[in-house]
Curated annotation (Swiss-Prot):
Gene3D superfamilies: Bira Bifunctional Protein, Domain 2. Catalyzes the transfer of endogenously produced octanoic acid from octanoyl-acyl-carrier-protein onto the lipoyl domains of lipoate-dependent enzymes. Lipoyl-ACP can also act as a substrate although octanoyl-ACP is likely to be the physiological substrate. Keywords: Acyltransferase, Cytoplasm, Transferase. Belongs to the LipB family. PANTHER family: LIPOYLTRANSFERASE 2, MITOCHONDRIAL-RELATED, OCTANOYLTRANSFERASE. This is Octanoyltransferase. Pfam families: LplA-B_cat (PF21948). GO terms for cellular component: cytoplasm. SUPFAM superfamilies: Class II aaRS and biotin synthetases. InterPro entries: aa-tRNA-synth_II/BPL/LPL, BPL_LPL_catalytic, Octanoyltransferase, Octanoyltransferase_CS. The active site is at 199 (acyl-thioester intermediate). The lineage of its organism: Bacteria, Pseudomonadati, Pseudomonadota, Betaproteobacteria, Burkholderiales. GO terms for molecular function: lipoyl(octanoyl) transferase activity.
Length: 251
């Protein structure tokens, strides 16, 4: 049985119409923050703190980051999906939905810190918009990809790697606001995926864009992906805050 990557707590995210005579609350442009290479725990703590302290006036943000090697296990995840206990890669238990996945250099990780009530977004709609953004990004590099019913993420559509997973997603919804997000494999060491059942699926092949013979620049793909996410969310221009450049890493 598949496990949803979305974990919902507290208030539901469905939004009713504004009271009669009350104007709709405008949706502010998304601020994009490029956080560089950052330890997973630092990103995890920061997005929880951001979500816990945000108010109705807090703007939505998208964080783009690259993590050192780490496995993350969702709150309902089964530790048995970590097949090699002494792999040398740390395991962090987190509060998103879903099972186990791997993050590492050469992978784009995007966290979506969104007020779903203000945006009048149902969770399923948000997941669809995220998946569409990844599919559109890969299409920009002439890679055909698809979603699978009951198995959130994005998969290779055809060829020798048909059915292999190239992107994963997992969200947490708290008080109508999302955090966590998605990961897209660009050019990375894929061997750590062999030590897990990716997203809880035994034998699931995981690939990156390089495996599909696409020599893509990490930063270029990241900018394409963020652009598609914003366009799919609301079509607004992002207010990009770039405190330091992300470094491409192929190790």
């Amino acid at each position: 049985m598949s496990v949803s990557p979305v974990s919902i707590v507290s208030t539901p995210v469905a939004v009713s119409a504004s009271p009669a005579g009350a104007p709709d609350q405008p949706v502010q442009p998304v601020t994009v923050r490029w956080r560089g290479r950052e330890a997973y725990e630092a990103s995890f703590d920061a997005m929880r703190a951001f979500t816990d302290t945000r108010t109705a006036d807090t703007g939505d943000e998208i964080w783009v980051v690259e993590h050192p090697p780490v496995y993350t296990l969702g709150q309902a995840g089964d530790p048995a999906h970590l097949l090699v206990a002494d792999s040398g890669v740390p395991l962090v238990k987190v509060d998103r939905g879903g099972q186990i996945t791997y993050h590492g250099p050469g992978q784009i990780v995007v966290y979506l810190l969104l007020d779903l009530r203000r945006r009048k977004l149902m969770v399923r709609t948000l997941v669809t918009k995220i998946e569409e953004a990844v599919i559109e990004t890969l299409a920009a590099y002439n890679l055909a990809s698809v979603r699978k019913a009951g198995a959130p993420g994005i998969y290779v559509a055809s060829g020798v790697h048909e059915g292999a997973k190239i992107a994963a997603l997992g969200l947490k919804i708290r008080n109508g606001c999302s955090y966590h997000g998605l990961s897209l494999n660009v050019k990375m060491d894929l061997r750590p995926f062999l030590a897990i059942n990716p997203c809880g699926y035994a034998g699931l092949e995981t690939v990156d864009m390089a495996s599909l013979e696409v020599a893509a620049d990490w930063n270029d793909v990241a900018h394409t992906l963020v652009g598609r996410l914003i366009a799919n969310l609301d079509g607004a221009s992002a207010a990009a805050d770039k405190p330091h450049a992300l470094e491409q890493s192929n190790d």
